[in-house]
Amino acid sequence: MKRSIILVLDSFGIGATEDAVDFGDVGSNTMGHIAQACARGEADNGDRSGPLHLPNLNKLGLGKACEESSGYFPEGLDPNVEITGAYGHAKELSSGKDTPSGHWEIAGVPVLFDWGYFSDHDNSFPKELTDRILKRANLPGFLGNCHASGTHVLDELGEEHMKTGMPIFYTSADSVFQIACHEETFGLDNLLTLCQIAREELEDYNIGRVIARPFTGPGKGQFERTGNRRDLSLEPPATTVLQKLVDEKGGDVISIGKISDIYAGCGITKKVKANGIPALFEATLEQIKQAGDNSLVFTNFVDFDSAYGHRRNVAGYAAALEYFDKRLPEVLELLQEDDVLILTADHGCDPTWEGTDHTREHIPVIVTGPKIPAGSLGRRETFADIGQSLAEYYGTSDMEYGKSFL
């Protein structure tokens, strides 16, 4: 019985790529810098302390993958452990370092075109664009119109938004148009309708995602994002391995978390909502138990990126990794004879790096299963090697990009 599980530790890069110079990311290393901070005692909080402790991931080859990628073996991990998984690192062929590019490339479809961006840090959006959105949504105006951290913009503009009913429009270095609105005073349904309008009006701008950022709370310092985020993505520009599995093999692709949004629903047969790493883990375990032949369980653990990477929270990132590692054996225990488990990422987001944006890094490619031989997979020239490997595993037609490691 053919079953695979992909767990994406969103933003968990393991060392800068050769082209990081083009992104201002030379020297970035999400995993490496977290490990260094932990070893120096700079990542202690109420949830964790001391050196980074990831024995299960390390046993599968994560430490070795980081070393092959960056030349640095993460402090706190045992360099002499017996490796039981196949491990490697992959560079990104896509032009960007964003979520859709990384995920689409994982599924065999690299983004070889340039996304549209709103590059101006202030007055970021064209007036003709925002005028059309406001007219269709029957809104008097909007706030923001800038590059901003999602948490900072709530403190700066959240109270004014609640008083005026004007949505907060903002962007970042990624190809995104983000809209933040209060769930109670503005309404979640109204926010989602507004985002759909924005998605339609952005068609000519080639913007990767419109992101709904609902929040709650009474005032500054007390606002919190909710779990009702929605990503309205463009559709992948070519057929992904997910679609081939469904169309050619009658298979099932189970999306957990924001996976379905990232692929605009393409190739997804079941969508499971869960918020937070514990809930995402529980949902993953339940779907693995239910999964049948020719199925793919695909989970994105977004909090590594959104709650810790972008917020430059090293201690929180380390604690989340250790939680993930502690629960990983629960997944391993569910693997059947022919199952393949792939642990990977979609880009980097080094919490020690300047700014709040993603970092251009190699991603780990950790593969295990009862029939997967242990050892190094070496450097993979594209994330699409994962998609090509899945195409070979399921017996679909080949992907245009990538080489199988199975």
From Swiss-Prot:
<keyword id="KW-0464">Manganese</keyword>
<dbReference type="GO" id="GO:0008973">
    <property type="term" value="F:phosphopentomutase activity"/>
</dbReference>
<dbReference type="GO" id="GO:0043094">
    <property type="term" value="P:metabolic compound salvage"/>
</dbReference>
<feature type="binding site">
    <location>
        <position position="347"/>
    </location>
    <ligand>
        <name>Mn(2+) 1</name>
    </ligand>
</feature>
<dbReference type="InterPro" id="IPR010045">
    <property type="entry name" value="DeoB"/>
</dbReference>
<feature type="binding site">
    <location>
        <position position="358"/>
    </location>
    <ligand>
        <name>Mn(2+) 2</name>
    </ligand>
</feature>
<dbReference type="InterPro" id="IPR017850">
    <property type="entry name" value="Alkaline_phosphatase_core_sf"/>
</dbReference>
<comment type="similarity">
    <text>Belongs to the phosphopentomutase family.</text>
</comment>
<keyword id="KW-0963">Cytoplasm</keyword>
<keyword id="KW-0479">Metal-binding</keyword>
<dbReference type="GO" id="GO:0006015">
    <property type="term" value="P:5-phosphoribose 1-diphosphate biosynthetic process"/>
</dbReference>
<protein>
    <recommendedName>
        <fullName>Phosphopentomutase</fullName>
        <ecNumber>5.4.2.7</ecNumber>
    </recommendedName>
</protein>
<dbReference type="GO" id="GO:0005829">
    <property type="term" value="C:cytosol"/>
</dbReference>
<keyword id="KW-0413">Isomerase</keyword>
<feature type="binding site">
    <location>
        <position position="310"/>
    </location>
    <ligand>
        <name>Mn(2+) 2</name>
    </ligand>
</feature>
<dbReference type="InterPro" id="IPR024052">
    <property type="entry name" value="Phosphopentomutase_DeoB_cap_sf"/>
</dbReference>
<comment type="function">
    <text>Isomerase that catalyzes the conversion of deoxy-ribose 1-phosphate (dRib-1-P) and ribose 1-phosphate (Rib-1-P) to deoxy-ribose 5-phosphate (dRib-5-P) and ribose 5-phosphate (Rib-5-P), respectively.</text>
</comment>
<dbReference type="GO" id="GO:0009117">
    <property type="term" value="P:nucleotide metabolic process"/>
</dbReference>
<feature type="binding site">
    <location>
        <position position="10"/>
    </location>
    <ligand>
        <name>Mn(2+) 1</name>
    </ligand>
</feature>
<dbReference type="Pfam" id="PF01676">
    <property type="entry name" value="Metalloenzyme"/>
</dbReference>
<dbReference type="InterPro" id="IPR006124">
    <property type="entry name" value="Metalloenzyme"/>
</dbReference>
<dbReference type="GO" id="GO:0030145">
    <property type="term" value="F:manganese ion binding"/>
</dbReference>
<dbReference type="GO" id="GO:0000287">
    <property type="term" value="F:magnesium ion binding"/>
</dbReference>
<dbReference type="GO" id="GO:0006018">
    <property type="term" value="P:2-deoxyribose 1-phosphate catabolic process"/>
</dbReference>
<comment type="pathway">
    <text>Carbohydrate degradation; 2-deoxy-D-ribose 1-phosphate degradation; D-glyceraldehyde 3-phosphate and acetaldehyde from 2-deoxy-alpha-D-ribose 1-phosphate: step 1/2.</text>
</comment>
<feature type="binding site">
    <location>
        <position position="305"/>
    </location>
    <ligand>
        <name>Mn(2+) 2</name>
    </ligand>
</feature>
<feature type="binding site">
    <location>
        <position position="346"/>
    </location>
    <ligand>
        <name>Mn(2+) 1</name>
    </ligand>
</feature>
